Amino acid sequence: MELILSAGIGTLTASGVYLLLRPRTYQVIIGLSLLSFAVNLFIFGMGRLRVNAPPILDPGGVGDLARYTDPVPQALVLTAIVIGFAMTALFLVVLLASRGFTGTDHVDGREQRGD
């Protein structure tokens, strides 16, 4: 499980960095989203991935705390997903406004020349 998760995090990070270095704004936004997903998976993985382990305590008593998973990374990831969605929507609006003003979607506002 850890090997698959770390391979997924590495793939998302590499793809995100590659897209961040591209000259078009839309690719940069997708790269930021992929990096956000990689960080979310990393935080989620640090919270002890367990199958059938509730993140809340039983009302009958505490018992053994090793049976429970940590709820804080789950709450952080859920919050990060919502904030990431809002930031992506904001970036897309800024992209559309920039394209309307400059007529291009390049990051620096200029078309690349084929010299």
From Swiss-Prot:
GO terms for biological process: potassium ion transport; proton transmembrane transport. Signal peptide: none annotated. The keyword Metal-binding does not apply. GO terms for molecular function: antiporter activity; monoatomic cation transmembrane transporter activity. Gene3D superfamilies: 1.10.287.3510. It is found in: Cell membrane. It is a multi-pass membrane protein. Pfam families: Oxidored_q2. One of its GO terms (cellular component) is plasma membrane. Keywords: Antiport, Cell membrane, Hydrogen ion transport, Ion transport, Membrane, Potassium, Potassium transport, Transmembrane, Transmembrane helix, Transport. The chain crosses the membrane at residues 4-21, 28-47, 75-97. The keyword Nucleus does not apply. Belongs to the CPA3 antiporters (TC 2.A.63) subunit C family. May form a hetero-oligomeric complex that consists of six subunits: PhaAB, PhaC, PhaD, PhaE, PhaF and PhaG. Part of a K(+) efflux system which is required for the adaptation of R.meliloti to alkaline pH as well as for the infection process during symbiotic nodule development. PANTHER family: ANTIPORTER SUBUNIT MNHC2-RELATED (PTHR34583:SF2). This is Probable K(+)/H(+) antiporter subunit C. It comes from Rhizobium meliloti (strain 1021). The lineage of its organism: Bacteria, Pseudomonadati, Pseudomonadota, Alphaproteobacteria, Hyphomicrobiales.
